[in-house]
Structures are given as C-alpha cells and as structure tokens.
Amino acid sequence: MSDRVIIFDTTLRDGEQALPASLTVREKLQIALALERLGVDVMEVGFPVSSPGDFESVQTIARQIKNSRVCALSRALQKDIDAAAEALKVADQFRIHTFLATSTIHVESKLKKSFEDVLEMGINAVKYARRFTDDVEFSCEDAGRTPIDNLCRMVEAAINAGARTINIPDTVGYTIPSEFGGIIHNLFNRVPNIDKAVISVHCHDDLGLSVANSISAVQMGARQVECTINGIGERAGNTSLEEVAMILRTRQDLIGVHTNIKHQEIHRTSQLVSQLCNMPVQPNKAIVGANAFSHSSGIHQDGVLKAKNTYEIITPESVGLNQNTLNLTSRSGRHVIKHRLALLGYPEGSYDLDQIYTSFLQLADKKGQVFDYDLEALLFFSQIQEEPEHFKLNYLSVQSGGSIMATASVRMKVGDEEVTEAATGNGPVDAVYQCINRITGYEINISKYDLKSKGIGKDALGQVDIVAEFKGRKFHGMGLATDIVESSAQALVHVINNIYRALQVAEHKERFAQKTVMETL
C-alpha cells in the first residue's frame, strides 16, 4: 500500500456552496492557481451541468492548470457526465467524479428506487464516464449510513465497472472516528477487488469530527482525503485541508504517511480563500487562525522564549506565517518591496511591481509605516482590480457629526464621463452610498456589511466586505483604505462594476440568441 495520501481539494465545488455570493470566474481561477502552488493532487472545481457559469469556470480552470489534476462533479446521469467531459477536455489531466446515493433513507426516500436499480445505475454511470477518461471516481453518497453489505456490493461493482477511485463520504457528518474507521477496515477485508482502486474519504463536520474521521480512515488504509481550505462548506463545513496536511506531517511517526502539500503555502492560501470568499477565519482555528501561534500565559511565554518546542508542536514558519516585523516606510525603494514580497512567497513576475509600488507609496504617506500584512493586502487588491473599471471613484467628501445631518459629495468616472452627486443619509457611509446609487441608477440592497481591521493600532487598514442584491442576484465587493468611509465606498464601487460586467454579459448573450434565431429563419 502506498505511503502517500492524495489530497483532493473541493474548495471550489463543495466549499463554494456555503458562500453568501458566488465567486466570479476570475476569482475561482485565482484560487485554483493558489491550490496548484499549494501542491494539491486533485482539485474539484465545479459541477458543469448545474449552470453555464459553472461550466465556464470549470473550462477556464481546466485550460490553465498544469500541475494538478482537474476534476468536475456529475450525478450518475449521462447528461451530467457529458457536460463534465466537455468542460474538462481542454485539461492536461482530468478526472470525472460521478456519485449516487446508497443509504437506505436516500435510496427509498430521495431516489425512490430499489437498491438493485441503484447498483445498476452506478455501474452504468462509471462505464459511461470511462468513455472519456481512465480516471473516474465514484462516490457512494451517505456511505456513513449505508448498510455495510450494500456498501461492499456497490464498491465492488463500481471497481469492476472501471472506477479507479472509490469515495466513501460521511455526507451528513454522522459517524465517529472508531465507527468510520471501521467502515474503511470492513471494505478492505470484504471487497475482493479493493486493491484495484484508491479508497477516498469525504467527511462533513456536523459533529465537529470531519478531520478526526478522515485521519481514522487513513489509518485504516484510505489513501485520498477530500477537503477544503479553512474547512469551508455546506452547513458546518468540510474536512480542513490545512489540519489534515499538518497532522500527517507532524505525526508521521505514528501514522507513517505523507502528502505532496507545500506546507509553507498554507497560510497564504488560507488568507486568499478567506478574502475572496468573504468568510473570516475564526481566531482560534487550528493552523491558520490569528491566535494559532499566540501565547498569552506568562508561564507559556517564558517556556517558549527558553525553547519554542515547550509549547509549539509546529512552527509558524512551517505553514508560511512570516513573523518578521520589519517596517517599511515611504523611503523604502522598489528593490526592498520586491525583496519583501519574495520573502512572503510572491515571486517577481506574479505581480505588477510599478503598480504595487505606487500603491505602497500612497499608503506609506498616509500611515508612515507599512507592514507585511499591508503589502499582501495591497497585492491582493491590485490583482482583483486589474480589469478596466467602467465606474471609478475619483473623489468623495463627507460632513457629519453631532446635530449635523450626514452629507456626502461624490465624483465618479462613468465610462468616459465624470459625474458628481450629493446626498444626505443615515450616517456618512449611507450618504456616500446614496450618491453612488444615484450616479449609477442601480437599485441595490446591501444584505451584508462587514468591517475588519487589517493591521494593528490607529493606522490599521480597514477592509470592508459587502454582499449586495441586484435583480435577484448577489454580488460581492471589497474595499481597503485607512478611512472606513473610503473603504466602504470602494466596496460598493467594486459591486457596481461586477453588476455592470454581469449586465454586459447578459446583453451579449441576448444579442447572440437573437442572431441565432434570425439565422434559423
């Protein structure tokens, strides 16, 4: 049996289902490239048959990723498998992942079929998927609650049909480690062709046991773990990639397996996913939380100063958390900025140095000192704003306080024109939003507003994340500035530009549809 555990990341498929607003294709690609740098073996990036947008994102990612295997999900239906194969065919290497429920409650209540019918459906789905690729994965949905005799029959049949990976999900997070490990142990003892496939596990965290169940399964012979960055996912989430990777690395003495994960990329990837998905990492989250390497107890501090391993079983550096607090100022040159970014894991060529340096100088003039977390924030925001903006904030002024009604004046570039608007509101942010909405003419409802501090003290940057609803769709926007009102305005302008692009796409599709109709007449 192999001593390597395959890491199958499903952040962009299962993880995205938990998000307050869908990611754009560009944002998904940004995460996919980060996952590739992290060293994931397989990345499941979407469910192509579910929507044209999902199909497009899977196809875009499949075309760009070279060092990881790209996977798409499909039900055990030919139309689903066709869509997955079509989206993936541009990839250097790809996998089709098809699934079917096997538990009694799912078979009888959801599928309304006999288990024999389900068994035949599973066999047919795997055989059909094998027409497109040798790399087919089959999942027994709700395996954790499937009678073991039925589960063994399904696994054996799927392997005989051509599945090279068999996934055993604890779909509702119901099992405990000894129980789930026992299921894997049973499969290895009772399925005669088990050596012809890799056994995978996909555990949910409804009882807080997803990571523990996954590790128990690995100890019993599973050699693929399906997981997400920061453990994001439906309901209580999925198995946390960073926790599994660091457990297998830290306790290799006990478990005896390894992964291909580049551990120094963990923190950077976690932060990117958190920011793009608008899902803050809880401070006490293992491995990547803000407090994961903090020591407040005097006894602990004394011990760590004498020998770090008294209270630290892993180092911050091992997950890419650079603790160097070297401050940068407006007197720092381009070479220094390039050097700092390289130390943070951003090689030259992965960003526009001139653009970053200009933003850095503007921030340094405001703050005096700029820290590593400021640089990463500037880099992140420069990357998501590379596309030309139809709407651009040029100027804003706000008056408020005491008995004065909040009043704002905003000047924006709209296409090639410049438009100015003034408005009052229930506070300075609302007044600015009233101005922006008047300028754009969009009727927007802000359903979520979140303010986070990026840094320490009075000069910290304020990051504003909002979710806005427009014509039944949700759009996500972010802004970053030392002034909260300014970062709030930036976030709404980000939303406005996303809406504008969506409307442009819809208009293009409508014109294309009309042209197609005319050509058929």
UniProtKB/Swiss-Prot annotation:
Query: EC no.?
Result: 2.3.3.13
Q: Which residues form the Pyruvate carboxyltransferase domain?
A: 5-267
Gene3D superfamilies, per this entry? 1.10.238.260, 3.30.160.270, Aldolase class I
Cofactor(s) listed: Mn(2+)
Segments carrying the region annotation (Regulatory domain) are: 392-521
Give the protein family.
Belongs to the alpha-IPM synthase/homocitrate synthase family. LeuA type 1 subfamily.
Q: Which reaction does it catalyse?
A: 3-methyl-2-oxobutanoate + acetyl-CoA + H2O = (2S)-2-isopropylmalate + CoA + H(+)
Q: Which InterPro entries match?
A: 2-IPM_HCS-like, 2-isopropylmalate_synth_dimer, AIPM/Hcit_synth_CS, Aldolase_TIM, LeuA/HCS_post-cat, LeuA_allosteric_dom_sf, LeuA_bact_synth, PYR_CT
Organism, as annotated: Tolumonas auensis (strain DSM 9187 / NBRC 110442 / TA 4)
What this protein is called in its record is 2-isopropylmalate synthase
Q: Which HAMAP family match?
A: LeuA_type1 (MF_01025)
Q: Where in the cell is it found?
A: Cytoplasm
Q: Briefly, what is this protein's role?
A: Catalyzes the condensation of the acetyl group of acetyl-CoA with 3-methyl-2-oxobutanoate (2-ketoisovalerate) to form 3-carboxy-3-hydroxy-4-methylpentanoate (2-isopropylmalate).
Gene designation per UniProt: leuA
What's any GO biological process attached to this entry? L-leucine biosynthetic process
- Judged by the first EC level, this protein's enzyme class is transferase
Q: Does the keyword Cytoplasm apply?
A: yes
This protein's pathway reads: Amino-acid biosynthesis; L-leucine biosynthesis; L-leucine from 3-methyl-2-oxobutanoate: step 1/4
Residues holding Mn(2+): D14, H202, H204, N238
GO molecular function ontology, one term from the record? acetyl-CoA C-acetyltransferase activity
